[in-house]
Amino acid sequence: MKNILVKGSGDITETREFFDFVVDKARENYMVVICGGGTKISAAFEKAGYVIEFDSLGRRVTRTWEERMIMRDVLEHEEKGLQDKFVGKGVVVISPILYAGSTLCPINGDDLVKAYELGFDEIYVFTTQERIEKKKAVFRNFPKVTVLAI
């Protein structure tokens, strides 16, 4: 039995290919899925009137409590949707939100993959065809990470 981590962008996690891959791997392994939601977070920020900004490391910049709440709400919605989808399949779903005490710390899902890398035997990051080269560059120094596009 292996420890397997899968991170799926919010644009991918609703696909049948993603679901089948995760369920197949979960049959014989311990499976953790990190949900994404970048596109949906951006849409929610725009709807609320916020400018979407990223830092030099590609992480979303949040300056206000409300922005962090928007991120949290989107990610928790994605997490709950995936949990419902994988009920009874032996899959643990988490969102990229950390808490330091009671302080909410949304973290980029790719950064969370890097942080968890030491504890997993296999890691898969799912993205879109349009983003695969960028995603491969993000993980080029992480040999356990396999980037897949749907």
Locations of the language-model features?
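Nucleotide/pyrophosphate-binding catalytic subdomain
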Residues: M1-I150
